[in-house]
Amino acid sequence: ITLKTGAYPMRELAMAIRWSSDADIDLLTIDGAPGGTGMSPWRMMTEWGIPAVYLHAMAYELCERLVKNGKRAPDLAFAGGFSSEDHVFKALALGAPYCKAVCMGRALMIPGMVGKNAERWLRDEDGGLPKTVSKFGFTKEEIFMNYEVLKAKYGEEVEDLPLGAVGLYNVVDKIKVGLQQLMAGSRNWKVGYISRDDIFSLSTE
């Protein structure tokens, strides 16, 4: 059982966390600005709600209070405009040990759509490959970094994979490898070892 909530003030966040604890749910996802939960359309996503870093810091403090009072803190997932491996690392560290996952929406939809468009362009639809893509190559193997990896894994079946899925795979692999590098550099050999000791603020604000 999971609940997803948006970039709301501390009172509402406290209610969501406490009620999730009381109901013994499996996961509470907290989507900070500029995330999309309850904040669409675009203008609201970019300008309304509590920014993710503040919202997620509040979530940590509220979970700490729950635990000190003998209550169970629910497992958390953080979301809110994340798009790269350093975002994932910092979110997990900021919410440790309560944050167990990081959610992404638009960051993964975009490569999926680019891959889907590339599939049409490679069939010479919509004017063919634009220069922004053709500078990387003119075939699937040249355009998609991990196409050969998928070919080695799936053999001839790779030809049936939608290029939107291939684009998504490329970005997820990039995030995975980047996160592994950050974890190795910080001496965290498992995701569960990432802690708040691994991050610090560069300014008092």
Language model feature labels by segment:
Residues I1-M145:
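Glycine-rich phosphate/ribose-binding loops and adjacent secondary-structure elements
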Residues I110, S134-E205:
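C-terminal extensions of enzymes
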